[in-house]
Amino acid sequence: DDIVSKKLVPPFAIMAYTKEAPIDTILYPFAEYSPEYQAILWARENNKECRFFDLESDIILGLEKRDDETKDEEIISETNPKKSIETDMEGFWERTLEQSEDMQAYRAGSALFGESIRKDTNADDKSFIRDTVRESFMKRKIKEYIEKGFDTEKIVAITGAFHTSAIESLE
């Protein structure tokens, strides 16, 4: 309810953090155009259930180590230096995909982008292993909803492009 309160105006972020040193944090940013925010608003306006289905933040923080994490910038600048003039993933995403006025092109482009990042990520990388654990959890949550009788045609999962192809297959 707080996220869709009239008192809370985007942009805003939810921050999860550890309580013991060294302090680690995760930020979940929300802008007016954020798919997650729009999904929450839609669910509220249409009296539908809306649930987060990622791993709990304390588990994610437990899996992460700052020194071991691959940065988004490294993926594009080191793996694909000649494929893009962008120097970071956020800039590439914003200028190449986010500003598309064609929804089909946006969906196709974001799917291709996510699959390309997955393909270029080393399967032994700790962040990839962490993401695989997260995706397995998300799949399990979706299966639980299906087992509870939720219609598969009425389940919508909002994920980042990197996770979409992994989540689409419930195997």
Language model regions located:
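Compositional signal for N-terminal targeting/processing segments
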Residues: 1-171
